[in-house]
From Swiss-Prot:
Species name: AKV murine leukemia virus (AKR (endogenous) murine leukemia virus)
Ranges in coiled-coil conformation: 437-478
Keywords linked to the UniProt accession: Capsid protein, Coiled coil, Host cell membrane, Host cytoplasm, Host endosome, Host membrane, Host-virus interaction, Lipoprotein, Membrane, Metal-binding, Myristate, Phosphoprotein, RNA-binding, Ubl conjugation, Viral budding, Viral budding via the host ESCRT complexes, Viral matrix protein, Viral nucleoprotein, Viral release from host cell, Virion, Zinc, Zinc-finger
Residues modified as Phosphoserine: 191
Site (Cleavage): 129-130, 214-215, 477-478
One GO term describing the cellular component: host multivesicular body
Gene transcribed to yield this protein: gag
Domain of life: Viruses
Name of the molecule in the record: Gag polyprotein
Record SMART domains: ZnF_C2HC
Modifications the protein undergoes after translation, according to the UniProt entry: RNA-binding phosphoprotein p12 is phosphorylated on serine residues.
Region ranges (Interaction with host PIAS4): 344-392
Single GO molecular function: RNA binding
Motif position, PTAP/PSAP motif: 109-112
Zinc finger (CCHC-type) boundaries: 501-518
Length: 537
């Protein structure tokens, strides 16, 4: 017990039945292998501080949730059931989780108390802030911070925080005490962008995925109120994300999220760019944004007056209280995003695209997002363009994991498959992959079978060598025996060897056969004729 470390991830795996029950209560289904993959490999890459061992910190969980629920190609719909289950476990922790969750102040169960009665001027509630009502009691001892152009923008730091039912802050405390008190009892928001909102907030809704803090919103007197970026926001964004040169896509997605959720002013945009980009990167982004300005005919224009009107480099005198001023600001943000996207494109390098391969435990959806990002970064092609779907599909097949790629190549009627069909088929193959235990068992079984086949082949070869050796020995023995027999038979017919002075006729020594006295002398007689038998005989 003392030598094992319990982590949120290991704790959920030990109580997996409870996790599945909680997921079922959320009307979702979760798998253990993907639960581990998302917690240890996917979510730590979101740059929101998610540890590989998991966490029950509701603030971090909601930040991951905002990434998962992001619209468009930056979202992760396949991870929704898992982050929703994490959130449910952290929001209402079961008994085995409570020792690992820090106590939190319970928010007021009732909605914020709004002024009621026949008041002639009830403070309106902003549609963007359904849980907030602006203060109606200004503090005259604090001077208001007005904008340079004399507009109605005011600093909410000089006002009392919005009233909340059941909880309030003493008006005798200073601004610093009020900020410190609210920060300690603040409920985590569903986005990493939380520190711009001063004062107490209601707990986020279950389906909330974006921050409710905006630099510009309607106040109690019907005028826009300005809340600037806090230094902690800028610090966290800069340190928790890669540089623009290193990963322009990720930083562009962050700035796009900030522009969408915070509605920053022109000054806020300059502060944001100056913090997150280097001087050279900022100049490149501004240049590309000005190139994206379109004229009245809808085509890109280079007329200085039109470019300066749409995307000014100097502080404009836009009146944000008017619809015209807000329209200018919306167009400026759109051009700024276009500049970020165009400036983030590197020179065409298809080798970089081909170098993007699926990781061993990477889901096909995550791999496809990395592949599309490589297309956007290293090629002039838009991977979302229907005309490029074939190229992206082929890259997806060839650069997938080997087991997935082989099965995708063998699909029937592959040419008619869309990219979505390929991704769904790849997800099915990915989810049916064998577990590490099954893979280990299969490798062990294959090794044993291979060893048995090798031994059988060795035994067969040894037997063949023995048979061949036996045949050769048999032939050799037969040859030896036959030679010995022939030697014995030939030895009987051979004449004995004679000495140098021995007679071949009488075998006596001292003379040769031609001088042998025992040899008959005289002419040879005719040979007797051999009578031949005839038919008459």
């Amino acid at each position: 017990m003392g030598q094992t470390v319990t982590t949120p991830l290991s704790l959920t795996l030990e109580h997996w039945e409870d996790v599945q029950r909680i997921a079922s209560n959320q009307s979702v289904d979760v798998k253990k292998r993907r639960w581990v993959t998302f917690c240890s490999a996917e979510w730590p890459t979101f740059g929101v501080g998610w540890p590989q061992d998991g966490t029950f910190n509701l603030d971090i969980i909601l930040q991951v949730k905002s990434k998962v629920f992001s619209p468009g190609p930056h979202g992760h719909p396949d991870q929704v059931p898992y982050i929703v289950t994490w959130e449910a476990i952290a929001y209402e922790p079961p008994p085995w989780v409570k020792p690992f969750v820090s106590p939190k102040l319970s928010p007021s169960p009732t909605a914020p108390i709004l002024p009621s009665g026949p008041s002639t001027q009830p403070p309106p509630r902003s549609a963007l802030y359904p849980a907030l009502t602006p203060s109606i009691k200004p503090r005259p001892s604090k001077p208001q911070v007005l904008s340079d152009n004399g507009g109605p923008l005011i600093d909410l730091l000089s006002e009392d925080p919005p009233p909340y039912g059941g909880q309030g802050l003493s008006s005798s405390d200073g601004d610093g005490d009020r900020e410190e008190a609210t920060s300690t009892s603040e409920i985590p928001a569903p986005s990493p962008i939380v520190s711009r909102l001063r004062g107490k907030r209601d707990p986020p809704a279950a389906d909330s995925t974006t921050s409710r803090a905006f630099p510009l919103r309607l106040g109690g007197n019907g005028q826009l109120q300005y809340w600037p970026f806090s230094s902690s926001d800028l610090y966290n964004w800069k340190n928790n994300n890669p540089s623009f040169s290193e990963d322009p896509g990720k930083l562009t997605a962050l700035i796009e999220s900030v522009l969408t959720t915070h509605q920053p002013t022109w000054d806020d945009c300059q502060q944001l760019l100056g913090t997150l980009l280097t001087g050279e990167e900022k100049q490149r982004v501004l240049l590309e944004a000005r190139k994206a300005v379109r004229g009245n005919d809808g085509r890109p224009t280079q007329l200085p007056n039109e470019v300066d009107a749409a995307f000014p480099l100097e502080r404009p005198d836009w009146d944000y209280t008017t619809q015209r001023g807000r329209n200018h600001l919306v167009l400026y943000r759109q051009l700024l995003l276009a500049g970020l996207q165009n400036a983030g494109r590197s020179p065409t390098n298809l080798a970089k695209v081909k170098g993007i391969t699926q990781g061993p435990n990477e889901s096909p959806s995550a791999f496809l997002e990395r592949l599309k990002e490589a297309y956007r970064r290293y090629t002039p092609y838009d991977p979302e363009d229907p005309g490029q779907e074939t190229n992206v599909s082929m890259s997806f097949i060839w650069q997938s994991a080997p087991d997935i790629g082989r099965k995708l190549e063998r699909l029937e009627d592959l040419k008619s498959k869309t990219l979505g069909d390929l991704v769904r088929e790849a997800e099915r193959i990915f989810n049916k992959r064998e577990t590490p235990e099954e893979r280990e068992e299969r490798v062990r079984r294959e090794t044993e079978e291979k060893e048995e086949r090798r031994r059988a082949e060795e035994e067969q070869k040894e037997k063949e060598r023995d048979r061949r050796r036996h045949r050769e020995m048999s032939k050799l023995l037969a040859t030896v025996v036959s030679g010995q027999r022939q030697d014995r038979q030939g030895g009987e017919r051979r004449r004995p060897q004679l000495d140098k002075d021995q007679c071949a006729y009488c075998k006596e020594k001292g003379h040769w056969a031609k001088d042998c006295p025992k040899k008959p002398r005289g002419p040879r007689g005719p040979r007797p004729q051999t009578s031949l038998l005839t038919l008459d005989d």
